[in-house]
């Protein structure tokens, strides 16, 4: 993000001073560039590639209506909106996906995640290890952990993360995918799937879901080029519920814990001339952190000054590097994302003319299991953030 004076992309001492006084003392893996190959059966002169990743051969543009639930709605317990921040999981900047939760299956795990619309599976990535179906139960069975990219058109994609066992028709075409490896349609043939057909088991008790439209670019990323090459889909993230008709749309929205618009959440908070939005530490270049794809903690140089993903009245400051604040002792639910005393001043009102502005970082409420409660301010002062 860029300020008029100076660029907000960088954490410059002249603009920002971070002072953290301690009271006591997981990520989405991005696609890596691969060589483009000619579409099967297509002459080179007519070959087209998608407009999000610039890698997958395709033939048509445009969105498609979602005619199938991606999972039985009666088995979905809740949907968390986009925009959550957690330095512990690598999401210092607001997440571009929703979190879909279910209960532990009663009996055999037989339900599959389904294609919401016609399209083709073009990329499946297997993470480095299998996971417990129920991470709270050490005797729970292990399930695979996949990230899957589903292309509906040259401009329209659905992405699922943390899916389980692949559907038989899909696994037959991919073969065994080793840990830490990927199946790519560029090196094979895209797997065509019709709306309502199975893709994979749900996986654990929560997975990630996002939809991206190359013809839509979020206005709240004032320098969209900073995401190119690392997470190019991010600036094209859209509300997935808009593609469903009733009654399915309302069925899904009834599971969403955010009750204010936009119900699907918000991820783009950059406002030029203010401190609001995503920041990248000087020398880290952009979202990539100036490290190789797959390198650990690329988000160390990330900072976001935004708002609560469930309750946008809550100011939220998320910091990628180790601040010295002991979250385990003082704020177990913070994970590097802190509240602000009084939720003021509003970051959208703070700019170069504001001089030195003090934010008192606060804990968040750590009680019960409701996400909305954990988004509210706690009572412990954790440090001082000076802008």
Regions found by a protein language model. Name each.
Residues 62-64, 85-88, 103, 134, ...:
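Surface-exposed intrinsically disordered loops and tails
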Residues 24-27:
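Bacterial signal peptide processing site
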Residues 365-387:
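Acidic, glycine-rich flexible loop segments
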Residues 136-139, 145-150, 190-213:
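Short hydrophobic beta/alpha edge segments that flank linear recognition/processing sites
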